[in-house]
């Protein structure tokens, strides 16, 4: 076994030696690493029960034993870093996407400085590297509510311990600026920052309600451009106009619903469930791709919720501009409910979503969290999976 592990380690190191840089923070090389990685007592090895072969046209997943939700992964030299939901944003390291993964600490030194939502365990981190510094964008909120905020922390190193929490960038529901369009009708969570070839940075965000939006950032990457002076240039990226399920408010006996200044409900959407979230922008010449998760992410203890076809799946649209419009194969705008499904439930892979794109010398990798239905449908058992991507006529196709 020791010989096998050594061989695996050497092969992994060789394969990761040539990584092309990406402004999106998806793959990096030649960056100093102040936190050397060694497997230890917190190491999580490859999945003991790998997902079974697909039976729905989708390939099986490369499954791992890393329990995670909404992962953000970058590669620095020969080491992969994963940032995910957990106390103060949990960081794991590995020499291979397959693992073994080791928890090495937290990104923040304590609670987020933003006084909203779940400050102890910020959601949906998105980490990028640019201009010699790492930036981790995160969100704080409460489930089912859009009284949310997006913050950012930065560091000269990707590991734990040396991050500065810059705090609030943008917020919805309540607080300064939340009455500005489109913040008065959107949900400021699931941040994703994309830096275009000309150096312009865009913050993509949104979950449920009116869907996914984009706003430009200032050059220092910690301030939204135009928010303070009334010149905010927001673009609507994607939406689910249909009512996929009834709102819980429809059966509520509550006399009042908490609302923002504009009258838009803060907790619960009386128009129904519009399950679109987790936007992630990537570039593969000559197109920009807007990836997102559609459907229900969690709460599958009820068997009926597992069989109605409304669980998470990964969709995409493309454009010739980072500002859109993004369309699917049929030419339907994502704002009008379009979206090409690239990966969904198959075999023991259930409800894949919370995705991102990682680029290495062999091409693009679609990574995500999913539930292994042969193990558990519990939220806490979501784990990291991934697939390679091929492009056919400019459209991404998941392969094993």
Curated annotation (Swiss-Prot):
Site (Important for catalytic activity, responsible for pKa modulation of the active site Glu and correct orientation of both the proton donor and substrate): residue numbering on this chain: 190
Protein name: Arabinan endo-1,5-alpha-L-arabinosidase B
The UniProt record lists the keyword Signal: yes
Domain of life: Eukaryota
Listed EC numbers: 3.2.1.99
Signal peptide (UniProt feature, chain positions): 1-16
Active site feature: 70 (proton acceptor), 277 (proton donor)
